[in-house]
Amino acid sequence: MAEISSSLEDYIEAVYSIYTKDNKVKAIDVARRLNVSRASVTEALQKLEQFGLINYGHYGTISVTEEGVKKAKEVIKKHETLSEFFENI
């Protein structure tokens, strides 16, 4: 599985989280969740698509690939572990 930047990790985690709750994701949803501009989201989504983690449709629909699900779960686990570590310091 390809290594992605910590910034892209935040994006795949957000996309996956929205997808599992609503079964549909739009760029504006990701922008609101991460409090970033739509332009930043578009750039990140294009990169995630290049890595094969999402499918980014012409009409703004986003779906998570199998690889994307694996990566998102890996990122969530990593973030939970870090959070637990810092809570116990």
Per-region residue spans from a language model:
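Canonical helix-turn-helix DNA-binding module
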Residues: 27-58, 66
